[in-house]
Amino acid sequence: MRVVPLEAFRDKIPFSVAIAAVERGFAALGRGEAELPDPMVLELPAQQAEVHVKGAHLAGGRHIALKVATGFYRNRARGLPSGDGMFLLLDADTGVPAVLLEEHGYLTDFRTAAAVAVTLKYLAPKDAREALLVGAGALEIGRAHV
């Protein structure tokens, strides 16, 4: 299994590529060509934390994608980020782990910003030139691109 650190891909994926990929994924899901089960949520009240595990597979795709995202809300007091995450890509034919992406929430935020852009493409008035995202937090990543 290849381990890919965040530094290897941070700021190297053009936002237009992310938007196109998200749009293709939504279209495949709409056509019934994607598996996207409900997330598993592990709540840890004693730690004021939660762990989310999500999975997806596109019909005919080379990989099964699994995402683990954590929220450990006491971490700020420890000088650590409250959220973290990684993606694990499994070979779709064998189930063998192929790639581990140490994304630390970066791809999650990037994908979410791309999803907002796709949503605006189809739902915003055609003459709209600006959009206001209230409470968008880390989604600011796509601010200049939407």
Q: Which residues does each PLM region occupy?
A:
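Conserved small/polar residues in nucleotide/adenosyl-binding loops
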Residues: I141-V146
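Glycine-rich Rossmann-fold phosphate-binding loop(s) that bind the pyrophosphate
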Residues: G135-G137
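N-terminal ligand-binding/catalytic initiation module
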Residues: M1-T108, A115-A117, A124-D127
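Conserved beta-strand elements of the Class I
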Residues: E130-L132
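Alpha-helix N-cap/loop-to-helix initiation residues
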Residues: T108-D109, E140
